[in-house]
C-alpha cells in the first residue's frame, strides 16, 4: 500500500496543478461522471469528525477523506483540521493508498477559490482581502495570485501576531505587497476579491 505524508504532497503537487484538478473534477461532477455523496458528520463535545467518499469515473479513483475539526487545537499546538485519505481499488475495494491530507485539504480548498477567482473575479483585479491568517489563509492567497495578477493583499486575523507573521511570510513567498490591518473592515474596503478563511460562527464581514 502506498503511503504519502504531507511533505510528499508539498513536494509533488503545485497550486496550479491543484486548481486544474479541481476544475476538472467540477466538470466531471456536472456531467454525471463523478460521485460525491454528502459528507457524514459526527458531532462530538469538542469537535467533529466527517467522512467524505468520492468516485471519479474517468480515472477509476475511489477515495474517502476522514477529517476532524477541533477549533481549540491551535492552543495545543495542533492544526484546527486533521485529515487522512484512504484510496481503494474500484475493482476489489482493496486499500491501495493512505494519504496524510491536512496539507492536501488546505491546498484543495484554496484551489476551489482559485477556480472561482478565475471565472468570477474581474480580470483587472489588483487588491485582495484575506480574512483569517492560518494555514488555509495561506493557500487561499496562493490560489488567488495564481488566477489573477494581484498587486496587494490586505490581511486580517483576530491575532495581531498571526496577521503580522502572515504578512511577512506571504510577501516573501508570493512576492507581492501584503499588508496586515487591524480590522476586517479595513481589509475588505475597495478590495476586488474578498476571501474568508475563518472558523468564526458569527459574521466577520458585514454588509455595511
Regions found by a protein language model. Give the residues of each.
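N-terminal ligand-binding/catalytic initiation module
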Residues: 1-106, 114, 124
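Short helix-loop-beta connector
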Residues: 120-127, 149
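A structural signal for isolated positions on well-ordered beta-strands in alpha/beta enzyme cores
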Residues: 129, 152-154, 179
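Glycine-rich Rossmann-fold phosphate-binding loop(s) that bind the pyrophosphate
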Residues: 133-134
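N-terminal Rossmann-fold NAD(P) dinucleotide-binding loop
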Residues: 137-138
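NAD(P)-binding Rossmann-fold cofactor-contacting core
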Residues: 146-174
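Rossmann-like adenosine-cofactor binding region
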Residues: 175-208
Amino acid at each position: 500500500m502506498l503511503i504519502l505524508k504531507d511533505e510528499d504532497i508539498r513536494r509533488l503537487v503545485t497550486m496550479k496543478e491543484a486548481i486544474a484538478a479541481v476544475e476538472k473534477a467540477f466538470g466531471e461532477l456536472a456531467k454525471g461522471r463523478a460521485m460525491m455523496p454528502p459528507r457524514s458528520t459526527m458531532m462530538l463535545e469538542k469537535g467533529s469528525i466527517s467522512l467524505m467518499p468520492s468516485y471519479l469515473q474517468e480515472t477509476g479513483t475511489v477515495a474517502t477523506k476522514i477529517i476532524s475539526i477541533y477549533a481549540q487545537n491551535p492552543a495545543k499546538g495542533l492544526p484546527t483540521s486533521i485529515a487522512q485519505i484512504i484510496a481503494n481499488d474500484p475493482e476489489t475495494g482493496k486499500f491501495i493508498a493512505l494519504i496524510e491530507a491536512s496539507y492536501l485539504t488546505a491546498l484543495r480548498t484554496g484551489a476551489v477559490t482559485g477556480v472561482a477567482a478565475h471565472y468570477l473575479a474581474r480580470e483587472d483585479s489588483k487588491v485582495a482581502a484575506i480574512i483569517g491568517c492560518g494555514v488555509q489563509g495561506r493557500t487561499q492567497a496562493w490560489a488567488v495570485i495564481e488566477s489573477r495578477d494581484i498587486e496587494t493583499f490586505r490581511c486580517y486575523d483576530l491575532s495581531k501576531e498571526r496577521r503580522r507573521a502572515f504578512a511577512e511570510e506571504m510577501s516573501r513567498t508570493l512576492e507581492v505587497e501584503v499588508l496586515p490591518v487591524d480590522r476586517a473592515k479595513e481589509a475588505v474596503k475597495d478590495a476586488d476579491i474578498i476571501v474568508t478563511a475563518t472558523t468564526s460562527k458569527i459574521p466577520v464581514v458585514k454588509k455595511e
